[in-house]
């Protein structure tokens, strides 16, 4: 007989859906995010990314630099209710230089929505992020966007997804025309045609006119050529396509496909309704104590993101926690796995981009914001009851390196604070020279834009101007076995040794050729392209 709390947890899990959106830049991710919020009633009017001077800034792009450039460069958490469900939407950076932030966000997601531009198909960043989803066996839902513009043939797009990503596809709806001739979609769930009408530039919910495929009026409403093309293509996909298999969807082997136009809102609600039915509910996580089910009564969760200065007026630091099990309650006391400290979780917050509301309780699948007084690191576990720690979150190997210089000694404290807080939140990796005399931090990034963001934020949020001194390295490898393993092999040529933020040795190479030379010279030296972002918590017993 389940306890009262277990019943409460089971009901809460049943009513929760959690997903991250992945895409290549400019596929329309921020627009789709806003339109989902529009249908969820979380906002009443969508602020399109284009023509920002005339319209409101997009809700999910809250950082000043994002609003200036019109791109997403940090993950955002947006929570809203739709029908019977509580939805946690994890918006991720679209820019490829911020794939590491996206990777961390995917660790907290139960499902992924892959957004594809109908004109361009699969693009490099989408492929890269798909590989991350595949590693975690995340269910992937595909939204093929921009049907109101000229694009590639739908069958061609499905074939590309199947061939390049190795996924089976199931078209939940099917487009009627494209570009100027786009007239709507046929929904295979309801067996109805949904007619396309542009609505107020997409600011408000689309007007949804539905009609049966066999309705006599259809000949006067649809282009005859497109009507017969639709019938032929439906016959083709229903005869030759795979049937919908939710077990395969949940294992990440089949992707349900949706067609629509986020900018005009068309197809967004059809997607949202089907997603609630098909998506994976919050599930179990592996820990040092084995598999932890969401209905396990003791509260636990992990930190997947830190953000400084979400409200620059208050110089705050927020830790984003994915609730994995049990019920979170305001002012509860928990244990911090890495340090063993006991922490009281006061002032928890429900997050909505930059806005936050106080929170009384949360359940598995929810994302909560906690004030971070310098205690939390990315990958940290918090728990009640029996000791446990979840697997750490690994990080990407950086490819660009530069000394960060502070030319103004009077700003030393602000400089140190800014670098420390940006390092904590994972905006960039920070390394240090082995030589104690060289005290300038080394920025280590996946892409150039990360450097620009760090410099911009140091100036904008901490009042510190900085300059960069680029270093001629492009490959980083962590030394397995730490300093003792490194000392045992003696001097290493064609590499320099630096320390990461946790004091662990990292070798920097100018190119892959130098890395191969070191492998040849020191075959017993084990190197790794990835390292956990936090100190190993698997020591917790």
Curated annotation (Swiss-Prot):
Localization per record: Cytoplasm
UniProt-recorded Gene Ontology molecular function terms: GTP binding; GTPase activity; translation release factor activity, codon nonspecific; translation release factor activity, codon specific
Sequence positions that bind GTP: 23-30, 91-95, 145-148
InterPro entries linked: EF-G-like_DII, EFG_III/V, G_TR_CS, P-loop_NTPase, PrfC, RF3_C, RF3_dom_3_sf, RF3_GTP-bd
Keyword Repressor among record annotations: no
GO cellular component annotations of the record: cytosol
PROSITE patterns from the UniProt entry: G_TR_1 (PS00301), G_TR_2 (PS51722)
tr-type G domain: residues covered: 14-283
Predominant location: cytoplasm
Biological process terms in GO annotation: regulation of translational termination
Keyword terms: Cytoplasm, GTP-binding, Nucleotide-binding, Protein biosynthesis
Gene3D superfamilies registered for this protein in UniProt: P-loop containing nucleotide triphosphate hydrolases, Peptide chain release factor 3, domain III, Translation factors
NCBIfam families assigned: prfC, PRK00741.1, small_GTP
Function description: Increases the formation of ribosomal termination complexes and stimulates activities of RF-1 and RF-2. It binds guanine nucleotides and has strong preference for UGA stop codons. It may interact directly with the ribosome. The stimulation of RF-1 and RF-2 is significantly reduced by GTP and GDP, but not by GMP.
Family: Belongs to the TRAFAC class translation factor GTPase superfamily. Classic translation factor GTPase family. PrfC subfamily.
Protein name as catalogued: Peptide chain release factor 3
Source organism (scientific name): Acaryochloris marina (strain MBIC 11017)
Taxon lineage: Bacteria, Bacillati, Cyanobacteriota, Cyanophyceae, Acaryochloridales
Originating gene: prfC
């Amino acid at each position: 007989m389940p306890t009262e709390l277990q019943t409460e947890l089971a009901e809460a899990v049943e009513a929760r859906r959690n997903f991250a959106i992945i895409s290549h830049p400019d596929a329309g991710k921020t627009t789709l995010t806003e339109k989902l919020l529009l249908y969820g009633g979380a906002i009443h009017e969508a602020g399109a990314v284009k023509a920002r001077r005339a319209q409101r800034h997009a809700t999910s792009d809250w950082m000043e630099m994002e609003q200036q450039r019109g791109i997403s460069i940090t993950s955002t958490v947006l929570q809203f209710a739709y029908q019977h469900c509580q939805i946690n939407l994890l918006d991720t950076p679209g820019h490829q230089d911020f794939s590491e932030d996206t990777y961390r966000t995917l660790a907290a997601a139960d499902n992924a929505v892959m957004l594809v531009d109908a004109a361009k198909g699969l693009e490099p960043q989408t492929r890269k992020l798909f590989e991350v989803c595949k590693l975690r066996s995340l269910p992937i839902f595909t939204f093929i966007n921009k049907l109101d513009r000229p694009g590639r043939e739908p069958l061609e797009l499905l074939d590309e997804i199947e061939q390049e990503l190795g996924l089976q596809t199931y078209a939940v709806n099917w487009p009627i025309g494209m570009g100027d001739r786009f007239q709507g979609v046929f929904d295979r769930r309801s067996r109805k045609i949904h007619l396309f009408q542009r609505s107020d530039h997409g600011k408000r919910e689309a007007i949804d006119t539905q009609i049966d495929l066999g309705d006599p009026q259809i000949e006067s409403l649809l282009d005859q050529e497109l009507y017969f093309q639709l019938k032929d293509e439906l016959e083709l996909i229903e005869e030759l396509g795979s049937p919908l298999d939710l077990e395969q969807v949940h294992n990440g082997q089949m992707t349900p496909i949706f067609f629509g136009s986020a900018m005009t809102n068309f197809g967004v609600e059809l997607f949202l309704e089907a997603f609630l039915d098909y998506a994976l509910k919050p599930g179990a996580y592996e820990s040092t104590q084995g598999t932890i089910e969401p209905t396990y009564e003791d509260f636990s969760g992990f930190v997947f993101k830190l953000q400084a200065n979400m409200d620059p007026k208050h110089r705050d630091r927020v830790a984003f926690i994915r609730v994995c099990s049990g019920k979170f309650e305001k002012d509860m006391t928990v244990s911090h796995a890495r340090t063993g400290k006991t922490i009281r979780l006061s002032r928890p917050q429900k997050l909505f981009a930059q806005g936050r509301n106080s929170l009384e309780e949360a359940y598995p699948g929810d994302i909560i914001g906690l004030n971070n007084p310098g205690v939390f690191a990315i990958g940290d576990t918090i728990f009640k009851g029996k000791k446990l720690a979840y697997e750490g979150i690994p990080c990407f190997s950086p490819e660009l390196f530069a000394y960060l210089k502070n030319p103004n000694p009077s700003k030393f404290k602000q400089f140190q604070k800014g670098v420390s807080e940006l390092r904590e939140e994972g905006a960039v990796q920070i390394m240090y020279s082995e030589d104690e005399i060289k005290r300038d931090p080394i920025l280590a990034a996946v892409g150039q834009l990360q450097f620009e963001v760090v410099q911009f934020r140091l100036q904008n949020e901490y009042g510190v101007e900085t300059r960069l001194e680029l270093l001629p390295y492009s490959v980083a490898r962590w030394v397995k076995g730490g300093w003792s393993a490194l000392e045992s092999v003696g001097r290493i040529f064609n590499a320099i040794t630096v320390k990461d933020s946790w004091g662990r040795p990292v070798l920097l190479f100018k190119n892959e050729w130098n890395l191969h030379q070191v492998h040849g010279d020191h075959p017993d030296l084990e190197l790794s392209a990835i390292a956990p972002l936090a100190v190993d918590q698997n020591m917790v017993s």
